[in-house]
Amino acid sequence: TGLRAIIAVHSSARGPAVGGTRMWNYASSAEALEDVLRLSRGMSYKNAVADLEMGGGKSVIIGDSRTQKTPELFRAFGRAVDTLGGLYYAAEDVGVSVEDIAEARKVTPYVLGLNDGPEASGDPSPVTAEGVYRSTLLAAKRLWNQDDLTGLTVSVQGIGHVGGYLADKLHAAGAKLIMTDVNTALLAEVAARTSAEIVAPDAIYDVKADIYAPCALGATLNPRTLDRLTVKAVVGAANNQLATPEIGQILFERGVLYAPDYVVNGGGIINVASELRARQTGGAYDASWVETKLSRLMDTLEEVLERSAAEKRPTHEIADAIA
């Protein structure tokens, strides 16, 4: 089938490793390996901070998700996951849809994020977006002491799965949006319904905004972008937003509120965890369990922000310590 994939299990201390499958056209297998290892480590922290009985794992399929997807490819991937015997469960991520996961499900039970069946949790993106939205409200309350986003400008980078749902929520809460994405057709569509201003991908760092929401790929907070950002807060859905831990230190010193990525974006994996839980107990998907876990995660974010201010330590260090 021409499948080239890497599955990384970072930790199974808390339970089976769970994490999404990303299909991306990596320049080399070395680049893919570096990405999957970084992402799998991030999942260990994300699952721990959300208090889920799961370890961290991640997988990548090397290829162009727009042109190289076939049902056979995902069945071959499913067979690879199956050989691990439940040590790792796969789910949707960048470039991989609910339909793709359903294809893998034909050959292995070790996939999550399905649409069919009583335990199915579906697309995790809306729940991820809800967590990012609530995190943004927390930041607005802390910095500007307001309960909505009226009068605030948010720059949204990436309006794919999560970014699109997030944009709708931010718009409804009164925020002015400036957005970018490499998918210009989708960008035009989302911008039209949220009255957003559109900018070129690299210009997103230079716009005048109050909050920056990175919702595309990781490491966008790096030496090249740091001095261009004029925002007071960073709250987004992307994984591994800080290129290095030092960037978190610099943001802290500059008085920029950085809401740690794996706390902010934990909604999706909580949703996926509910499906695993239902499957283990023979029960059904439980939306109220998801809501309880999500509110607790937001309490944790509040604790991170409060401790960061009190202890004069960067938020990413506090979050790591809690996880």
Predicted segments with their positions:
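N-terminal ligand-binding/catalytic initiation module
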Residues: T1-E119
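Conserved active-site and cofactor/substrate-binding residues in soluble primary-metabolism enzymes
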Residues: R4, A27-D35, Q68-E72, A76, ...
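Flexible, glycine/charged-enriched surface loops at secondary-structure junctions
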Residues: N47-E53, L87-E92, W144-T153, P201, ...
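General beta-strand structural signal in soluble alpha/beta enzymes
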Residues: Y88-E92, L112-L114, M179-D181, V199-A200, ...
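Glycine-rich phosphate/diphosphate-binding loop of Rossmann-like nucleotide-binding domains
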Residues: D123-I211
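Adenosine-phosphate binding glycine-rich loop
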Residues: A140, K232-I322
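Rossmann-like adenosine-cofactor binding region
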Residues: T184-P260
